[in-house]
Amino acid sequence: MANSKRQLFIKRRLRVRNKLRKVNAGRVRLSVHRSNKNISVQLIDDVAGKTLASASTLEKDLGVVGKNNIEAAAKVGAAIAERAKKAGVSEAYFDRGGFLFHGKVKAVAEAAREGGLKI
């Protein structure tokens, strides 16, 4: 029986995350989630099991509420880079999950790099 799109997405997400964990043990993870309406990003310390910082298009401070485009993704990336500095994080590895590194996901990564976060 053929796998559904959702099942393939979950397999891809787990495959990507497991490969990243093997290589980047002990480092902070920059995790991206993209939905049809919003983008959210978290800095996660997997060793402690805590979220150090987060940013989303749902936040009114960013001025992009309800927008899901590349410009909004870039603002979220810049915001997470700024919050990472406040949390004392200068380096993280990028976890794209099951999403392709293209468009909005790529815009988040590039804006975070421009903001001073080493990815």
Curated annotation (Swiss-Prot):
GO biological-process terms attached to the record: translation
Keyword Calcium: no
GO cellular component: cytosolic large ribosomal subunit
rRNA-binding keyword on record: yes
Intrachain S-S bonds: none
Signal peptide, first to last residue: none
Keywords attached to this entry: Ribonucleoprotein, Ribosomal protein, RNA-binding, rRNA-binding
Pfam families recorded: Ribosomal_L18p
GO terms, molecular function: 5S rRNA binding; structural constituent of ribosome
Record family assignment: Belongs to the universal ribosomal protein uL18 family.
Function of the molecule: This is one of the proteins that bind and probably mediate the attachment of the 5S RNA into the large ribosomal subunit, where it forms part of the central protuberance.
Binding partners and assembly: Part of the 50S ribosomal subunit; part of the 5S rRNA/L5/L18/L25 subcomplex. Contacts the 5S and 23S rRNAs.
NCBIfam families reported for this sequence: L18_bact (TIGR00060)
Protein name from the UniProt record: Large ribosomal subunit protein uL18
